[in-house]
Structures are given as C-alpha cells and as structure tokens.
Amino acid sequence: MIKIRRGLDLPINGKPNQSIEDGPQVRQVALIGFDYQGMKPTMAVKVGDRVKLGQELFADKKIEGVIYTSPASGVVSAIHRGDQRVFHSIVIDVEGDDALAFNQYAAADLAGLSAEQVQQNLVQSGLWTAFRTRPYSKSPTPGSKPHSIFVQAIDTNPLAADPAVIIAAKADAFANGLTLLARLTEGKVFVCQAEAANLPKGQGANIAYESFAGVHPAGNPGTHIHYLDPVSASKTVWTIGYQDVIAIGELFTTGRLNVERVVALAGPQVDRPRLVRTRLGANLDQLTQGQLKAGENRVISGSVFGGRRSFGNLTFLGRFHTQVSVLLEGREREMLHYLRAGFNKFSVMGIFISKLFPSKTFDFTTSTNGSERAMVPVGSYEKVMPLDILPTQLLRSLIVGDTETAQKLGCLELDEEDLALCTFVCPGKYEYGPILRNNLTRIENEG
C-alpha cells in the first residue's frame, strides 16, 4: 500500500450519501469537444439527422481510425462552434431506444480474445476514446500498445462518489472489463484502489491490484503513474476510469453500448446530496432542476478543484466526469476581512482561528478571495504536492514557457488535475491547469 501524506482533503459541506438513486430524466445529451485534447472533428452527421445509440457522429482528423459515437438514440439538434470554428459540442435530443449492435461474446470466451478483436470492438463502438494517454492525455492511436494501463478505481476528490459502491452493483461487468484490458498490453494492468477495497478480479496474469491511502490526490491517475510506472517522452501509459471498465465489460457480453453514468450530485448548494444514475453527456440544467438551494448557483461538471463550469453550449456532463458539484457564486466583498479572526474561513496555511477546529467544514463559494498577482513562493505548493518533484520551480518554468526546464522537472507526468491543488493554494491566483496544457501542446508540437 502507498500512503499519501502531502495533499489536501477539502473540508467542504454537502458530501453525498453513498447510495444510488435514479436521477431526473434528461431529454438532451451531448459530446463536448474540450473533453478530447487536440481533437479536430470530421462530422459524419448534420443538424436534423436521426441517429442511433452507438452511431458515428464524427471522426478525429488528427488520429486516424478514432471515431466518436452517439450516447443516445434521437435527433441531432445542434452543433456548436466558437471563435475560429472551434468545436464546442454536438447536442442530441433523446428519442426512442434504437441502437447499433456490436460484436457479442460469452463471458467465458473473453480471456481468449486477441488484442485485435478487443480493439476492433472498442473502436467501432466509440469506447476506444475512454482511454487517455500519459503524457498528453489524448486518445491513443489504434494499433498502439501502452507500457501499462491504469484503472482508476479510487476517487479522493472532494464530494466524490465511492467507486466501490458503484462497482459492487456491476461486479461481473467490471471483472469482464479488466479481463479485456489485460489483452491490450503486454505490460501490467494496474487496478488502483482504496485501502481494504475488495474489488472483483479479472482474468489475466498481468492484472495487479495496488492500494492507495491518505489525502487527495491519492486517487489521481497522475499519482498512481508517478509511483508505479513513471512516463517519459518515449514511454506511454494509458488511463481509464472504473465506470468505463464496466461499460467495456457490458459491451462485449451484450453487444450494446452502455452509456449509464452514476455521478455524485453534491455540494453546499444541493438540497439532498447523493449518487444519481444518469447517462453520458447529460444536460446538467435538466439533471439539477429542482435539486438545488435558492441563490445564484454555479453548477460544475466534475470536481470543485478542476471541473468545468456548466453554461451555454457546455451545459452537459463531461466525458470523464463522475460528479456534479454545485457552489454559490461568491460575488459579495467582505468589509475589513483582514481584521477578522476567520472562524468561518479556511486556509491551508493555518492563518485563521478555524485551524483550532480541525473537524469543521465550510460552505465554500466560487470566490477566489483576491485578484491575480505575482507568484509568491511561501511553501504552499510543497504542502499539497505528493509527487517527487520541485513544485515551485516547475510552476515557474511553466508560467514563463520554459518547456525544456519543465520537462526536466517532470511536467510530462502531469495532467491538469495534478496541479489543481497548486491552483487552489496559490497566493497569486494562477490557473496552472491551462498553463500546463499550453506547455504540453508546445512540447508535443515541437517534437
């Protein structure tokens, strides 16, 4: 077991009840372009077309053979683009239950399938895009093989669902999914789980179960990769979420694409925080209707640390998100706040009197408590960075765009979520996720 001691468990109110209920029915779903790094779509449908569940919507111009399929049966109601025609989302009005059929196998035969058979079914169904490479967090090229595959079956994000609860309800599908993943690599399939978790076992001598404990980011794939199989410019691993492993298992045994998603609907502004059963790409306005407390609320697809604000063309559940967080917009300014003891305020540096009450939780808002300013190295990054890197030096190199130094300091191991805590504790209010992504894009483009 690997114990993470440096990090942060955010003391936020609104933790979800860990039991699954059916969520409000959604009438719209969408695929969001920003969920797929560097993807350039070639559309296979247009507005007004009727599509089936699992039908191709578009292909990736940059990665030959990768297609993106419909998460519902219905009608394409909108294709949204932004400045310079950047793809935002493709929206489908859910109607009927028509679905494409894919190759189906008996559970007993899965361990005997070839890597080519597994890959073909995943690519044709669109589930291939559930994998993300590290470095760069892109969909892998069909035909490629990773050094290892990481299954994220632990989640330490604030307000997250307990993966063990969701996996227990689909134990056979999860085990079948692991068996299939083992066919895709000659290396290890690392199933990263919480301490004392008893997850279903797949068939494959290369499947390894690794336990992590401690504070967030103990559940991040970046943390698992760093300790178990670090990457480099010449070494690639893949990551995949536990609910996608379940979907893979069900695809092969039923021949039908499973788009069910269990998400944690939680946060200080949620009336009844709990786990709800919905579907991939669900419209979050419809999912949260009648579920929130009064006030100006911000609905977030994903974690409060690194999720995406739900608004306009992006009012949908992200492809890789398993929670919907809701915070009150923090627009009010507090007079003479610097003279107050801060009983109802939180600080990583322990400068408020609330530090004397370690079990206290808070109604966090969206306020950043200040504007952007110079980066000040006061030791806050080191408090929340569990990886064996120099965070202050790395962040400085990212800010100034020194990609050579950033690579030497370990930026290729990282994704946006791995720097989310650094953003949260930053005295200068920098958003390190987008800064990291800009540097990674430059590194990849420059070869």
Swiss-Prot record:
Reactions catalysed: a ubiquinone + n Na(+)(in) + NADH + H(+) = a ubiquinol + n Na(+)(out) + NAD(+)
Enzyme Commission number(s) of this protein: 7.2.1.1
Gene Ontology biological-process entries: sodium ion transport
Highest taxon above the source species: Bacteria
Keywords, in A-Z order: Ion transport, NAD, Sodium, Sodium transport, Translocase, Transport, Ubiquinone
Gene Ontology MF, one: oxidoreductase activity, acting on NAD(P)H, quinone or similar compound as acceptor
Enzyme class: translocase
Disulfide bonds: none
Role description: NQR complex catalyzes the reduction of ubiquinone-1 to ubiquinol by two successive reactions, coupled with the transport of Na(+) ions from the cytoplasm to the periplasm. NqrA to NqrE are probably involved in the second step, the conversion of ubisemiquinone to ubiquinol.
The protein's assembly and partners: Composed of six subunits; NqrA, NqrB, NqrC, NqrD, NqrE and NqrF.
Family assignment from sequence similarity: Belongs to the NqrA family.
Protein name: Na(+)-translocating NADH-quinone reductase subunit A
Provenance organism: Cellvibrio japonicus (strain Ueda107) (Pseudomonas fluorescens subsp. cellulosa)
